[in-house]
């Protein structure tokens, strides 16, 4: 999967993840087409900073990335909160907090806490929690990780006009694409197909290139 972090004219990083670890292209070496293996702390420098509310948007890989960051940050003693403004899969009940007492108990056990409201149509999923409870939990946290987009489990997505669903409190956005989309046709791997065709000026049989994926990110 690939990530585009802190996009700006002055500072950006493109991160790739495989089973063996994280790899980074940065502004200083991207022209040489070199990558370097980095730790999760180096790949996502905001983890070494103060409190952040981070929204994850885009396509395949958001949940696994959130889990990796939550696991590492919890191991560093941080009170990590995972939630959603769209939908996420329901965690084990012992990690789901419905009130402040449960939240503190989960953190005291060294795990990250998850909050959300049960989705009526699918009991295995959570939707965005009640906003007052969400903001209370965020206030108590050291790091907040929000899944703020959906892609029907496809590796590629071009957002609709109403997407992603970002809270005003969120100060960092991480865009995600699954590298498994590379070399595959738009119709096979891209959510919001018509949006993707328009963005790339391509038909549904077009095979995604590195340049296409950069354009989408």
Regions found by a protein language model. Give the residues of each.
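N-terminal phosphate/diphosphate-binding loop that engages ATP/GTP or pyrophosphate donors
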Residues: 71-124
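Conserved catalytic-core segment of NTP-binding enzymes
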Residues: 123-134, 149-217
């Amino acid at each position: 999967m690939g990530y585009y972090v802190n996009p700006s004219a002055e500072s950006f990083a493109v991160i790739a993840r495989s089973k063996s670890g994280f790899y980074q292209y940065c502004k200083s070496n991207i022209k040489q087409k070199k990558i370097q293996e980095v730790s999760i702390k180096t790949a996502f420098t905001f983890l070494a900073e103060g409190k952040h509310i981070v929204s994850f948007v885009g396509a395949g890989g958001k949940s696994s990335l959130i889990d990796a960051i939550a696991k590492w940050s919890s191991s560093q003693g941080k009170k990590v909160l995972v939630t959603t403004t769209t939908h996420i899969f329901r965690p084990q009940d012992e990690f789901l907090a419905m009130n402040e007492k449960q939240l503190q108990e989960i953190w005291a056990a060294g795990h990250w806490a998850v909050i959300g409201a049960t989705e009526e149509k699918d009991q295995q999923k959570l939707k965005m929690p009640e906003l007052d409870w969400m903001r209370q939990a965020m206030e108590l946290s050291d790091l907040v990780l929000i899944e703020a987009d959906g892609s029907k489990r496809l590796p590629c997505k071009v957002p609709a006009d109403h997407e992603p669903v970002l809270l005003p409190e969120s100060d960092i956005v991480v865009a995600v694409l699954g590298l498994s989309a590379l070399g595959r046709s738009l119709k096979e791997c891209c959510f919001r197909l018509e949006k993707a065709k328009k963005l790339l000026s391509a038909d549904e049989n077009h095979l995604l290139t590195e340049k296409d994926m950069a354009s989408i990110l």
